[in-house]
A protein has these predicted regions:
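Phosphate/nucleotide-binding beta-alpha loop and adjacent structural elements of enzyme active sites
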Residues: 1-67, 71-379
Length: 379
């Protein structure tokens, strides 16, 4: 049994003290480690677009490599030095080593795809080519606040299952050590927790459709048996989302952001796009915002069934502006808790203290800090 499985299976339902939490955290080991050297019988796992680079990179080390498993490859490639096959499956006993080309952005598509493919096989532990990851991880750093441990413990005690509990504690440790490799990647799609997702015939409130890809995904997975109200304040994203969603009659795009009041704020684009109360630089521009309560109560919708938020750090404010809808309808929730460094503490705390009978789960969907979601259901 792996360290991950051993710790996962032994987690307590509740933690009673900061000392107990600290002791538990010592048991958590990195799930993904950077490595410069190949072990015997290694399987190189890479994306098809990176295959030629990987073959050149590992030239002369073929004696350590059992095979190249390639994501996106349709048929086996004959090679006199090493076996090259399409990715099909791995076992937890395999010595898997991920190779990808480093990306200057905080998100790396190839690495994301490799890690998600492994997570869907319930494989959390593998190595990463150090030269792939070193540039990538050097860009990650988070301010960390140590005096919130008791609140984090209270959030942990409200979670429903061990995978959520493990994920939550690993978030704490990863931010403390500035190393996201402690966080497991859950085996279900983002926003689609098996017990807290949108259902057919739901009215979906989507905060942050961006280019409309997630909006279309809701429609496809719900077989178009849903109505979606999507709020996007950025005019470029709004235009792109409108083009993406133009053939869907059940999608309504609103050119506003979600916040705790109805009025005007500013969009700041220094790093990630985010909504701010005051202009930070000359290029910042005004945007309209509304609260979920103001919009849905005034529009006289009978019920909001599901709320998804990925709104660049405005999630807590938007939830504060949704108290009446949360109390009236108790919609299923999928709320991002990673944009601000303490969102993973403050947002679960806010939802927990509403005391609406929600069951809570946490899911992490990428091999870095981003894309952590708290899921909730009161159904």
């Amino acid at each position: 049994m792996s360290n991950f499985e051993t710790v996962l299976n032994a987690l307590p339902d509740t933690i009673n003290s900061e000392q107990e939490a600290a002791k538990l955290l010592t048991q958590f080991q990195p799930l993904r480690n950077m490595s410069f050297e190949l072990k015997p019988d290694t399987i190189i796992f890479c994306d098809s677009k990176d295959l030629n680079t990987a073959l050149e990179f590992y030239k002369g080390q073929e004696h350590c490599i059992r095979a190249f498993h390639v994501l996106g490859l349709k048929e086996e490639i004959k090679n006199k030095n090493v076996k090259i096959v399409p990715f099909t499956t791995f076992t937890k006993e395999d010595n898997i080593h991920c190779f990808f080309l480093p990306d200057l952005r905080p998100a790396c598509t190839a690495y994301r795809n490799l890690s998600i493919a492994l997570s869907k096989l319930n494989i959390q532990e593998y190595t990463i080519e150090a030269k792939s990851a070193s540039k990538f991880y050097r860009r990650n750093s988070f301010i960390f606040i140590n005096n919130m441990l008791q609140t984090a413990i209270d959030n942990y005690n409200a979670l429903e299952d061990n995978l959520s509990r493990y994920t939550y504690l690993s978030l704490w440790k990863s931010r403390h050590l500035c190393n996201p490799n402690y966080i497991p990647i859950v085996p279900y799609d983002q926003y689609w927790h098996p017990l807290a997702s949108a259902k057919e015939n739901d009215l979906v409130c989507e905060g942050g459709p961006a280019n409309g890809i997630t909006t279309i995904d809701f429609c496809k997975k719900l077989r178009n048996k849903c109505d979606i109200i999507a709020f996007e304040p950025d005019p470029v994203y709004y235009t792109n989302a409108a083009a993406t969603c133009k053939d869907y009659q059940n999608i309504r795009l609103i050119p506003k952001g979600l916040y705790d009041f109805t009025g005007t704020l500013y969009i700041n684009t220094d790093n990630y796009v985010k909504v701010v109360k005051q202009k930070i630089k000359e290029e910042d521009f005004e945007c309209s915002v509304t609260s979920i309560d103001d919009y849905f109560l005034n529009a006289k919708y009978d019920k909001v069934d599901f709320i998804k938020m990925d709104i660049e750090g405005a999630e807590l404010n938007a939830l504060m502006g949704a108290k009446q809808i949360l109390q009236r309808d108790k919609p299923n929730l999928a709320i991002c808790i990673y944009h601000n460094c303490i969102d993973f503490i403050t947002i679960p705390e806010f939802l927990r203290k509403l005391d609406l009978g929600y069951k809570f789960y946490t899911g992490h969907h990428r091999p870095w800090y981003a894309e952590t979601v708290i899921y909730a259901t009161a159904r």
